[in-house]
A protein has these predicted regions:
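Short, glycine-/aromatic-enriched active-site segment of Class I SAM-dependent methyltransferases
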Residues: 180-200
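A short glycine-rich, Lys/Arg-flanked "PGG" loop and its adjoining helix->strand segment in the class I
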Residues: 159-174
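Conserved alpha-helix/loop element of class I SAM-dependent methyltransferases that forms part
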Residues: 39-40, 56-74
């Protein structure tokens, strides 16, 4: 659990909680589901919810691609750090049948995740825990795979982050991730999907990610920059249906527009990787 005895850390966590807060998230989700012509009382599929619950760059498409790269098996125990509404966890549980533990610091997002797990009938395979990435509430050597999408940008202490991930992975375990990395110039457009202002954004370069993970005992299996591919495959965010991130993300158009502009101008880079514990 977060240790807020450090005043500065407590203030930062409070600011992060505010950034990822969504009042009455369960009511918003249910309203959006019905507006999309779906019945919450009937079992929903993760695919139907894909535009709503994958709060990271590339959405459901990016999650599917990372799933393939990570080579997760049905028998694997998976930890999703910073799981949000647990969209990726449901995808993994639905497609592969594996069990997934989620750690999510936002109480609102945990409530939304629990609702969607129940509506998809996957609440027996997914458990959502309070906590944060630097103090994971699990024993050493607990997981075959740690999964993380667009979370590290909010964490300043990368060494501690990588150390915790290494700690909870079993020998031979894999860390599969997607992150925004620092580009050629400082990020100047705010708010962004992950940060209201510069004080919440802690980007490092691709080389620093590789070096930091290597220093923590990981071996790189894959680390690639997918910025250009992402920009060529997507356009500015639109709202083709009621099921969008805008259901619970305030000022989505502005945040998404700033993120795209930052990518186009090279201020940030979109990267993904799979690293293995020795």
């Amino acid at each position: 659990m977060p240790n807020t005895s450090d005043p500065e850390k407590g203030l930062f966590l409070a600011g992060l909680e505010a950034h990822y807060s969504a009042r009455d998230i369960e009511g918003r989700i249910l309203t959006a589901i019905r507006a999309a012509g779906l019945e919450p009382e009937q079992r929903l599929s993760p695919e139907e919810l894909g535009a709503l619950d994958h709060f990271h760059t590339g959405g459901l498409r990016a999650s599917r691609e990372l799933l393939e790269l990570a080579q997760i098996r049905a028998q694997d125990r998976v930890l999703d750090i910073g799981a949000g509404l647990a969209g990726s966890a449901r995808l993994l549980a639905f497609v592969l049948g594996c069990r997934v533990d989620c750690v999510e610091p936002s109480a609102d997002f945990r409530a939304g995740a629990a609702l969607l797990n129940r509506l998809t009938g996957l609440d027996d395979r997914i458990e959502v825990h309070p906590g944060n990435a630097l103090e994971l509430p699990f024993a050493d050597d607990s997981f075959d795979v740690v999964w993380m999408q667009n979370v590290g940008m909010n964490i300043a202490d990368k060494r501690a982050l990588y150390g915790e991930i290494y700690r909870v992975l079993k020998p031979g375990g894999r860390y599969a991730f997607q992150e925004m990395a620092a580009g050629d110039a400082p990020t100047s457009y705010f708010p962004l999907p992950w940060a209201t202002d510069p004080g919440d954004s802690f980007l490092v370069s691709v080389d620093e990610i590789r070096a930091g993970l290597g220093d923590s005992g990981f071996i790189a299996e894959l680390l690639e920059d997918t910025s250009d591919a992402h920009l060529s495959q997507t356009t500015a965010y639109a709202a083709p249906s009621p099921l969008t991130l805008g259901v619970y993300v305030d000022n989505l158009a502005q945040k998404a527009g700033n993120a795209r502009r930052s990518l186009e101008e090279g201020q940030v880079r979109l990267v993904r990787g799979v690293f293995r514990v020795i």
